[in-house]
Design a protein with these regions (language model features):
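N-terminal basic, low-complexity leaders that serve as flexible interaction/assembly modules and, when applicable
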Residues: 1-87, 326-339
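Short, flexible, mixed-charge acidic loops at enzyme active sites
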Residues: 32-34, 83-96, 147-160
Length: 339
């Protein structure tokens, strides 16, 4: 386990720490914009291995990050299960809402079997990625369920909230299905070459504590337990965004190797609260990266100084903003390397 990221995930306080960024492949890179123009349909782009491989590798070539994360989308799995999915400019993903037992029963099982193009991408990246570790990923079952029930991202998620409170049995049946499908999807990525896998629960912060434990922590812990049995040497990371006061409990109970943390949390303080050895990943504010200059330098140094001597992966609290100058990302890479 010589790759820096994998050593940190194994509990080693690697220094300087490994660094990669959420959305490190994306619209802030001119080479990505040029590539993206070749396939305007986003699902087609993600499921064309030649394009997805290139998108995955672009930030590795430019910045020599310690990890490459598969270029894909958290909604590819429900799409492969039969959900309608379209990406509209200015709106993001739009799906046909799933709000009754008949809609859940209409899903086709074994969605991972229809995502062979994603596995081709994983295998091809693994052959070319060099010293960077390759991270596969999926959406957390709760976050995927949010999109399926609501049909799109909404400010207050009214349909989702009504369903999970008024018909919890139905909502849990959807979560159970997504949990099973996610295990199979991540296992397929591992078998194709992923060296670590990550769950993105972008909407975990919507829930009160009791439902967070039931609908976020529970499914993640179940996925973690299954993966530890089938692939014990492959670490799992999880990003329960905006979980805040529940992060220490999540780290203790989810069984993951690392918890990724958003920018609203004092990362060194969280590290002191942990009851079990878990690597922490994060959590520079993406707006500090966008600003560059003194803001970037100061915030990066505060984070690095606070996490020295701990298992730590330097990342952002969320994805790279599209307007971020690539020169700022290059400077951040230098700051971490010089820590």
């Amino acid at each position: 386990m010589s790759k820096k990221l994998l050593r940190a995930l194994g509990g080693e306080a690697v220094w300087p720490p490994p660094v990669w960024l959420m959305r490190q492949a994306g619209r802030y890179l001119p080479e990505y914009r040029e590539l993206r123009a070749k396939a305007p349909d986003f699902v087609a782009f993600c499921t064309t291995p030649q394009l997805a491989v290139e998108a995955t590798l672009q930030p590795i070539r430019r910045f020599a990050f310690d990890a490459a994360i598969l270029f894909a989308d958290i909604l590819l799995l429900p799409w492969a299960m039969g959900a309608s999915l379209a990406y509209r400019e200015g709106e993001g993903p739009v799906l046909s809402p799933v709000r009754d037992a008949e809609a859940i029963a209409a899903f086709r099982p074994r969605g991972a079997e229809r995502l062979g193009a994603v596995m081709e991408t994983v295998a091809a990246v693994k052959r070319q990625v060099g010293e960077a570790a390759l991270i596969g990923f999926a959406g957390g079952p709760f976050t995927v369920a949010c999109y399926l029930v609501e049909g799109r991202a909404e400010r207050d998620w009214p349909a989702l909230r009504r369903l999970l409170w008024e018909d919890p049995a139905l909502f849990e049946s959807l979560l159970d299905l997504l949990t099973e499908e996610t295990v199979s999807y991540l296992e397929a990525q591992i078998e194709a070459g992923a060296e670590a896998v990550m769950l993105f629960d972008s909407w975990a912060g919507l829930l009160p504590a009791s439902r967070f434990r039931r609908y976020v922590l529970g499914p993640v812990a179940a996925i973690s337990a299954r993966l530890r049995r089938s692939h014990p040497d492959v670490p799992l990371l999880a990003f329960p965004r905006a979980a805040n006061a529940l992060l220490a409990e999540f780290a203790a109970g989810a069984g993951v190797a690392a918890v990724s943390v958003d920018s609203g949390v004092d990362l060194p303080a969280l590290a002191r609260q942990l009851s079990r050895p878990v690597a922490l990943q994060g959590n520079l504010d993406p707006w500090a990266l966008l600003a560059g200059g003194t803001a970037l330098e100061d915030e990066a140094k505060i984070l690095l100084e606070g996490m020295r001597g701990r298992p730590f992966i330097f990342n952002l609290g969320h994805g790279v903003l599209p307007a971020t100058p690539p020169a700022h990302v290059a400077r951040l890479r230098e700051l971490v390397a010089a820590a």
